[in-house]
Amino acid sequence: MDNVFPELTRAEEQVMQVLWRRGPSFVKDMLAELPAPAPAYNTVSTIVRILETKGFVDHEAFGRTHRYFVLVPQDEYRRFSLRKLLGGHFGNSFSRLVSFFAKEENLDAAQLDELLRHAAHPSIPNPDEPIQPA
């Protein structure tokens, strides 16, 4: 069964992106990686507490501060988001989604062939995606 997650705001997604990239982090470390203009420390602290109530993160206490870590893997949330996008805007049709992006991005035949190759053989690395450390 697929997981269903609560809706995330843009700010919540930005904090999750930092946590997925960095791993367990303190609020001050997250602040340094958020796009400018950086929100206030208290704002980020509030966002991670909201993410905690939504079940996306948890924390370890270190004295009076907390180090936050993810509970929802990025790939799992990515799948959920894509399914929601497909269902809400493309009638659950992957071909409609690909057709839309092909038109929007003016993809040429070689790019479409590469996309089809990746769809047929998901183990082929995507040259545009950073390699994750083992």
PLM features: residue spans?
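Hydrophobic residues on short alpha-helical segments
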Residues: 13-19, 98
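Short, hydrophobic-biased segments on the C-terminal half of alpha helices
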Residues: 45-49
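Conserved segment of winged-helix/HTH DNA-binding domains
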Residues: 73-98
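C-terminal regulatory/oligomerization modules of transcriptional regulators
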Residues: 103-134
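Glycine-centered, phosphate/nucleic-acid-interacting loop/turn motifs that mediate DNA/RNA or nucleotide
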Residues: 55
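Short, cationic-aromatic polyanion-contact patches
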Residues: 5-11, 62-81
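Short capping segments at the starts of secondary-structure elements
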Residues: 18-26
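Short acidic, hydrophobic short linear motifs in intrinsically disordered regions
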Residues: 25-34
